[in-house]
Amino acid sequence: GCAYALARAGKTDLLLLDRADDVGEVTTSQGAGLCGQVRDAAERIKLAMHSVAVFRELQRSEVKPDWHEVGSVRIALSDRRAEEFRKLKQAADDAGLEADFIDRTEAKRRWPLMDFTQAASVLWCPSDGWMTPRHVAKSYEHACRKMGVRVATSTGVEEIRVKNGRVTEVKTNRGVVECKYVINAAGAHAYHIAKLAGLQLPIVPVRHEYYITLPMTGLSPDLPCFRIPEMTLYGRVRDGGLLLGGWEPKSLHLDPRSYGLNGTPTPVEADWQVLDSFEESFSQLFPAATGAEKGFVGKGWPTFTPDGRFIIGESCRVKGFVMAGGCNAHGISGSGGIGKLLVESLLERRPSAYVKSLSPDRFTETSWTWDEARVQAARVYETYYGV
């Protein structure tokens, strides 16, 4: 997404490095693929809206991201949550995003198999949707190559060379590359890449899981995505089955120092106690979920920051070293918007206050500790749907 945005802005002298044998085959392939735009602040909504615009654009290309603009329903089960929805609706209005309240009858028409009798409020966003994350990566890659961007897979970064406070070269397992800028969009390894440049940044991997059932009667691919904040659940239809995920109230998180640049985070084993709890909760609204045979389990370590904001932009401590990380589980769905913010941070003479607030320089080495960062980042995850 970053390379695509830069290339669209005319900066095509880019070399995209991926340690894996193919772009998007590791962490990206585990994503759930939902893209929601309703947020609590206009800046965040506009970021998500730009991502949707990019997915629409890519869907018209030869290699498609498998974008399905099916809309979404956000379901409140209490008056308190319904009040939050009213604030979200106002934020959407302020940002120019279409989002409307619908009654239970209309909600039932859009999602016939779901029971809306408990719903205190339902917020409908027609331009939300879902994509296939691996296809998104391949679509970006194809578009980038067409614009002249070079892509090198099976290429791992070993060293970032800095001279007089500025990035000059990157040493890889396949040779040395001279460069003026390094953009760090390395996900769970973003901490390690930053460390190579001499920066310590609090980028904390937190476990996340979802499951997909085998095909179920009545689930069609045009059904809307759904979010049920009080149950901390989200979902959609995938391959004729139910994709159901959630945000755990007691998260499992890692210290990125526990694995090296050439290593991998501890493999995530399916936690059936957690996954079954998702099923138990959702069965209150969708009884057919009870006992549905589970097939694929998606799992991984998306990275979170202590303040819940992305880390985007060039560091004043190491000129030419640019961050695009700590995406708080929105690296795929927000990729188009993140690319836009990155371009603004690098190419605009006066970036917006919002973009400036995402700077890596907000984390100085004396402003945080790892113990605090892990607790705070985990809290961001655990209160994702907090009121």
Name these PLM-found stretches.
Residues 32-110, 232-235, 273:
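Dinucleotide-binding Rossmann-like beta1-alpha1 core, especially the glycine-rich loop
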Residues 54-57, 77-147, 152-153, 159-166, ...:
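Flavin (FAD/FMN) cofactor-binding and adjacent substrate-gating region
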